[in-house]
UniProtKB/Swiss-Prot annotation:
Monomer. This is Ribosomal RNA large subunit methyltransferase M. Its EC number is 2.1.1.186. The lineage of its organism: Bacteria, Pseudomonadati, Pseudomonadota, Gammaproteobacteria, Pseudomonadales. The active site is at residue 300. It catalyses: cytidine(2498) in 23S rRNA + S-adenosyl-L-methionine = 2'-O-methylcytidine(2498) in 23S rRNA + S-adenosyl-L-homocysteine + H(+).
């Protein structure tokens, strides 16, 4: 099991390679990364078989920025018929797993394999159970089978508590018809990713206050209002009338980068199209000056050196807040609903 297989957004294979290579260097793991542009996946091949497991046990998956999902294992070539027998033979040395996901990559070819996977899963699951390779135990690793085609599959495993919460890292979120824009799903996905579900009622509680910078027409504001959070929506553009009638929104026509609330708020959210360095400086100001307790902010990405630039900006925010003597947790992820951007979550601890 010397190979790590990583899913990603198509076009960001290079960023995944850069990030996983950086991680391997920090862990002193020799190996190399490779990816085909547009393939929606990347691989890291470790020089030593045990290093794949060491890498995955040394870091939390949620701390990675560009990978959507990961697994360690190897490729298996399948015949036209009797695929299950060949797979069982290939899995002979794998540990007993507590759950099974059949996955595909996020490309048109991958999506065409979804029907095959749905038909194949039931007989495969039955065979794995009979062979004793699959049991119902959430504490055991998850078996992740990523089909590149009907004849090639990456047979991988990952610890059930250290991988994506959805197959392929793709959330199944329903667009609310009342929301004024599809961008609303970005904020909902961010909450799922950064905030444990059991903490939502505490950290996204009715009666809290928020500022939405660059709010129009109100996709992110809608999510806040839906949880009965009072929002100051900052944008020179018009807000959806339905939100203004809700009684939870005050519209301030102002520049999102210069606006400051009269009183600290619980949340600041921002999805403004701007150079990432300027947005990063704004994040540091809001958290550093105690203007908000938590924030979800999108950083738009440059055309080149995207991983290096994100890493540089995150380090800058972290060091800037540390110099102020503040304890702030920082998370960053390219979410499924993100495009040429990443989503940052920051939470200030203490006073």
């Amino acid at each position: 099991m010397n190979t790590l297989f990583l899913h990603c957004r198509p076009g960001f294979e290079g960023e995944v390679c850069a990030e996983i290579t950086d991680l391997a260097a920090r862990l002193d793991v020799p190996g190399y990364s490779k990816a085909k542009p547009g393939s929606a996946c990347a691989e890291f091949v470790c020089s030593e078989a045990a290093d794949g497991e060491r890498m995955m046990r040394s870091v939390r998956f949620n701390s990675l920025i560009f990978p959507r999902q990961w697994a360690r294992g190897g490729f298996v070539m399948l015949p036209e018929s009797d695929r299950i027998s060949v797979l069982l033979d290939a899995l002979a040395d794998y540990p007993v797993c507590g759950s099974l996901w059949l996955e595909v990559v996020d490309t048109n070819d991958g999506k065409e394999l979804s029907t095959f996977c749905k038909k194949f899963e039931a007989p495969l699951r039955k065979a794995l159970l009979k062979a004793g390779k699959l049991v119902d135990d959430a504490r055991k690793p998850r078996l992740l089978l990523t089909f590149k085609s009907g004849r090639e599959v990456f047979a991988g495993i990952a610890e059930a508590d250290n991988q994506a919460m959805w197959p392929m890292g793709i959330p199944r979120l329903k667009f609310p018809r009342e929301a004024p824009s599809r961008s609303t799903l970005k904020l909902e996905e961010a909450w799922h990713h950064f905030i444990p579900r059991e903490q939502w009622d505490q950290r996204l509680a009715p009666g809290m206050t928020a500022v939405d910078l660059g709010a129009a027409p109100g996709g992110w504001t809608w999510q806040l209002v839906n949880r009965e959070i009072r929002v100051t929506a900052v944008d020179n553009g018009p807000m959806a009338e339905s939100l203004m009638y809700s009684g939870f929104v005050v519209h301030q026509r102002a520049d999102g980068f210069t606006f400051r609330p009269r009183h600290p708020v619980h949340w600041m959210v921002c999805d403004i199209v701007e150079k990432p360095a300027r947005t990063a400086a704004m994040i540091e100001t809001w958290l550093g000056e105690g203007l908000c307790r938590e924030a979800v902010v999108n950083l738009k990405l440059p055309m080149k050196q995207r991983y290096a630039e994100v890493r540089r900006l995150l380090d800058r925010i972290e060091s800037g807040l540390a110099e102020r003597g503040l304890k702030v947790s920082i998370g960053c992820k390219q979410l499924y609903h993100d495009r040429e951007e990443v989503t940052c979550h920051l939470r200030r601890h203490g006073k």
